[in-house]
Amino acid sequence: DTDRSRGLGDVYKRQAPKLIKGEELNIIIGSRPFRDDEGSELVKLNIMLILNEKYGIVESDFISAELEAVPAFKAKDVGFDRSLVGAYGQDDRVCAYTELMAVLELNNPEKTAVAILTDKEETGSDGNTGLRSSYLRYFIADLASTFGVKGRTVLQNSRCLSADVNAAFDPTFPDVFEKRNSALLNGGVCVTKYTGSRGKSGTSDASAEFAGEIRRLLDANGVIWQTGELGKVDIGGGGTVAAYIANLDVNTIDVGVPVLSMHAPFEITAKTDIWAAYRAFEAFVNN
């Protein structure tokens, strides 16, 4: 993608929601023309040839393809002490990975453990791959039927950690945080009792009993943890998929890694917090 030179135009007069327009998010994919042909779209022809040779893609495939454009750099150590991880998409890969590893490393668990890696969270969780669909309820019902019980009985007796990040306190922008109720880098995995917009709008508010259960579990297993809200109440906020699981009558609470620069192309997390998240999920699925 490109950015306008600082000295050109009236970009500084734009309001924040219009700072970058959707139609301005154009990706640079090449500039070299195809040599052995004549025509007006030689650059396009050359790019299509490369895509075809590498991936077998032809132009009509773009109608049905799902493509993901990501920053062209690998995850990096951040800081002179290399204590941080910098990478794109840590919301929510950093929680998905730690959750998945905790489940994969289980050996003959006493209780059934399920890791749900679901889609469309950032766009509302709609569609048949989002958690607002019925696929999870049907999946649990199918599992329950093999034991001769009802799916709703299994759901009502289940517990869930919604593995999602929280915003770490950023001293560069302290005005959007309530410092006494914000997660800190290197403070451990963050337990978030509720999220929502401007308080608890559109939230899942975990019960006091379940929040206490998780607190005792983490303490008993020596997991470093903290609590935090997603910014000041009147500033905004955010949501997770916890509400959609809780709506199935499952005790659910958000647990995840604090992140600096959430949703930026280069998000930052602390390695100790990532380890604490893994330890938290490990303790949960083993108890």
Model-derived features: positions:
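Single conserved hydrophobic/aromatic residue that forms the stacking wall/gate
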Residues: 1-8, 12
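Active-site-adjacent substrate-binding region
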Residues: 40-61, 169-264
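Flexible, glycine/charged-enriched surface loops at secondary-structure junctions
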Residues: 56-66, 109-115, 148-157, 218-232
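Acidic-glycine-rich active-site phosphate/pyrophosphate-binding loop
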Residues: 60-78
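Glycine/charged-rich beta-loop-alpha catalytic/anionic-binding loops adjacent to active sites
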Residues: 74-86, 258-261
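Alpha-helical metal-binding/catalytic segments enriched in His/Glu/Asp
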Residues: 86-127, 132-134, 138, 280-282
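His/Asp/Glu-rich mid-to-C-terminal helical/loop segments that flank catalytic regions of hydrolases
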Residues: 103-117, 257-287
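A glycine-rich helix N-cap at a beta->alpha junction
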Residues: 134-161
